[in-house]
Amino acid sequence: SMKESTKADWDIIVARYQPFAKELPDRILAHLRLLGGDSGGFAVDRLQHSLLTATLAHKSGEDEEYVVCALLHDIGDTLGSWNHPDVSAAILKPFVSEANHWMVEKHGIFQGYFFFQHVGMDRNMREQFRGHPHFERTARFCEIYDNPAFDPQMECAPLEFFEPMLRKVFSFPRNSIYKNTCEM
């Protein structure tokens, strides 16, 4: 058990953990590919939507971290069908700024501005966050990147284009209690 473990035990565990941790970008890319083929009723599948969102952000000159957040903003769809923004944000949290994390975490509510009224919800639900330092950033993300990225006629970069950016962002955690214990 962990209670009876020793430093020697943890040296072994950490040594075995490091290669696993370094493979995180590979697992993220594999999971992102799972979004392909499922459109959920939209004109594009979830992978194409993610690629379109990231392409729009990249073409607009957003930094690599922001582009990776755009790419992964819906990666939670497969395992978090009822709370995908929370799942996506949890994956990103150790590696991105607080502003980008908040944007991904809240994007579902902000995106609702465009459709909640059609499903019996309050389209102004995002107003509860009015005045938050990241309100405008998140509203902008949904308005100019997430919302338009359902157009099947729009050109998007392939996943391989974003891979170096993703690997860079996920190269080392900056917001984790473990960041100083396991050098990746």
Task: Identify what each model region corresponds to.
Residues 1-71, 75-184:
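Metal-dependent phosphohydrolase cores
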